Amino acid sequence: MARRGKKKGRPISGWVIFDKPKGMGSTEAVSKIKWLFNAEKAGHAGTLDPLASGMLPIALGEATKTVPYVMDGTKIYRFTVSWGEERSTDDLEGVATKTSDNRPSRADVEALLPNYTGVISQVPPQFSAIKIDGERAYDLAREGETVEIPSREVEIDRLEIVGIPDADRTEFEVECSKGTYVRSLARDMGRDLGCYGHISELRRIEVAPFTEEDAVTLAELEQAWPPLPPKDEDGNVVEPTPRRDFSAIDALVIDTGAALDCLPQVPLTDDQAQRVRLGNPVILRGRDAPLEADEACVTTRGKLLAIGYIEHGQFKPKRVFTTG
């Protein structure tokens, strides 16, 4: 039997709420964060387009097990729609496909907003990660194919105007569900207003349960990053190699359990925690312990231990974390 290779990197776990700069792709951002923390494992909770900036929650280590909970969270975006052009990508990156000299008034736009709140039907952009017969829509679009992307239901909790810099642009803020394409929102509003439109600025400012206050910039991360061991003229590490101190950058990591604010959380005793670590159910004690829950998590000494469900006052683990 082949021996498994040793994992490279540190077994650090938690969330880094990265303030992604414009021009950086989501995959590139994950690779950068993984390298800065020298982490064994990393992944993000929801793609952010390269032309967009703002919050990209990145999970390290065991926190990758909680990614689905963050992906399901409500998102808030601030964005600018430039009127007068519809573009192939529905943002600045594409070429103009339709143009108009019409420009909407504030009253025109405000009258339209109720049509875009609540549960609405939306067709994702041609340039999107949606799979069509096993292929990404953006790959097909780059090959010149026009694909039929089925509409999907999304939920818009709030959509409002936050600024009008000039007649050509309107600034909005939207609070929406997972799967909402803000580019499609701009495209559809432009069509309904008879003037066409595309996204010219896009920033994500919240991914529940995390807020903009949790975000850290690349500059802040690099400032806290421990330098690599010194090398001589031949590129060899100078001996003895000093141990790298990651404490400053690790202080920017948010606890794994923060992603599970939507779930009931129950603290366990040390004995109960040991049983759960072995995959066994435990009876929950205390007046406040829930009797039933489709999903819940348990903690030990303030650290997340497991996700599972509660049935007749008994917690049954489904996913156990090594950090607890």
Curated annotation (Swiss-Prot):
Swiss-Prot/TrEMBL catalytic activity:
uridine(55) in tRNA = pseudouridine(55) in tRNA
Q: Its Gene Ontology molecular function terms?
A: RNA binding; tRNA pseudouridine(55) synthase activity
In the UniProt entry, which residues are flagged as the active site? 49 (nucleophile)
What keywords is this UniProt entry annotated with? Isomerase, tRNA processing
For whether the record's keyword set contains DNA repair, the answer is: no
Which Pfam families does the record cross-reference, listed alphabetically?
A: TruB-C_2, TruB_C_2, TruB_N
Which major enzyme category is it?
A: isomerase
Q: Name one GO biological process term.
A: mRNA pseudouridine synthesis
Q: Which Gene3D superfamilies match?
A: Pseudouridine synthase (3.30.2350.10)
Q: What does this protein do?
A: Responsible for synthesis of pseudouridine from uracil-55 in the psi GC loop of transfer RNAs.
HAMAP family xref list: TruB_bact
Q: Which family does it belong to?
A: Belongs to the pseudouridine synthase TruB family. Type 1 subfamily.
Q: What is this protein called?
A: tRNA pseudouridine synthase B
Name the species this protein comes from.
Brucella anthropi (strain ATCC 49188 / DSM 6882 / CCUG 24695 / JCM 21032 / LMG 3331 / NBRC 15819 / NCTC 12168 / Alc 37)
